[in-house]
């Protein structure tokens, strides 16, 4: 079973890394792939350029074990990064191996705004990183999907290639890339929020400076 963890990673930080580790361990994934996005269709463009964001990810994962990998196909493809196209490409390579698209709760609640969002369920399971004790309000279309597809036992994800929704509580570190960029613009320290080697690269190349 393979996990797909997409994002701009602008910059990558310990919130991303800790969540990825817990997902990989809890779901017993063979591999978890970090998938840096070239251009998110529904958000402003990233601040750092694609190759710099990729370098930061490479540095952050340099000491990781074999369970993490980088998938650069969205950067290589260029243009808006539609997840349905990305998963279609991955599915052609992986055959019937179960795929898990890993998303945060906010992204999941916005799923009906994604390009061809219903098609995602024929390509992968969706694993939602849930906040403890959080009341969820769904759009009607998404509510029906959850009612039809939610499973509560993660072993069910391994039983078929795609189509299920699983909510996973992970350690929620109150770290956001937006906040880190703001701190750096204001000249404040971002130490202990992201790997030191990533922070060194940011300072060396004056990323996110005024």
Curated annotation (Swiss-Prot):
Keywords: ATP-binding, NAD, Nucleotide-binding, Nucleotidyltransferase, Pyridine nucleotide biosynthesis, Transferase. GO terms for molecular function: ATP binding; nicotinate-nucleotide adenylyltransferase activity. It is an enzyme of class 2 (transferase). The keyword Transferase applies. Pathway: Cofactor biosynthesis; NAD(+) biosynthesis; deamido-NAD(+) from nicotinate D-ribonucleotide: step 1/1. Pfam families: CTP_transf_like (PF01467). Its EC number is 2.7.7.18. GO terms for biological process: NAD biosynthetic process. NCBIfam families: cyt_tran_rel, nicotinate (nicotinamide) nucleotide adenylyltransferase, PRK00071.1-1, PRK00071.1-3. Catalyzes the reversible adenylation of nicotinate mononucleotide (NaMN) to nicotinic acid adenine dinucleotide (NaAD). Belongs to the NadD family. This is Probable nicotinate-nucleotide adenylyltransferase.
């Amino acid at each position: 079973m393979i996990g797909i963890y997409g994002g701009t990673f602008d910059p990558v930080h310990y919130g991303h890394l800790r969540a990825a580790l817990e997902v990989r361990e809890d779901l017993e994934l063979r591999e978890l792939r970090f998938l840096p996005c070239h251009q998110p269709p529904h958000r402003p463009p990233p601040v750092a350029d694609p190759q710099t964001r990729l370098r930061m990810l490479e540095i952050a994962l340099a000491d990781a074990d074999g369970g993490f990998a980088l998938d650069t196909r969205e950067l290589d493809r260029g243009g808006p990064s539609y997840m349905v196209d990305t998963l279609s490409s991955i599915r052609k390579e992986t055959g019937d191996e179960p795929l898990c698209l890993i998303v945060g709760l906010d992204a999941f609640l916005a799923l009906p705004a994604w390009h061809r969002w219903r098609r995602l369920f024929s390509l992968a399971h969706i694993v939602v990183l849930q906040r403890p004790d959080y009341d969820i309000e769904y759009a009607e279309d998404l509510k029906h999907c959850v009612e039809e597809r939610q499973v509560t036992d993660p072993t069910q994800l391994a039983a078929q290639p795609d189509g299920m929704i699983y909510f996973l509580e992970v350690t929620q570190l109150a770290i956001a890339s937006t906040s880190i960029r703001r701190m750096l613009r204001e000249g404040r320290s971002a130490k202990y929020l992201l790997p030191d080697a990533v922070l060194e690269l940011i300072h060396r190349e004056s990323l996110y400076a005024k």
